[in-house]
């Protein structure tokens, strides 16, 4: 009998909110994975790194903000444009220091329309976040 192993990398996804808007990034055109898409800021979890630390590191690297508090929203599975399988752990950033700046993407901007994001998985994540906020 042949065994099948599903290998996937961990990805930490941050939802940064201001009023009724959430922060998105347009990935650079020269990215090898999902170039120029509009998506939530995220990044790979390093080996032996806990999810919360990965999220804090990624938000500092990509947005220049120091994350103070987070709330788990959901876990999703996604296959990137290069075939990489990802387990995406999505967190609402409830408190942070600093003002977000674009450090890694083509641009960042505040958005209120989930349909402006390219990935269905990101749209579902923001919907879930909004449902949790209403409770």
Show the residue positions of the predicted features.
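Conserved hydrophobic "DFG−1" position in protein kinase catalytic cores
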Residues: 16-17, 24, 93, 110
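NUDIX/MutT-family hydrolases
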Residues: 92, 101-133
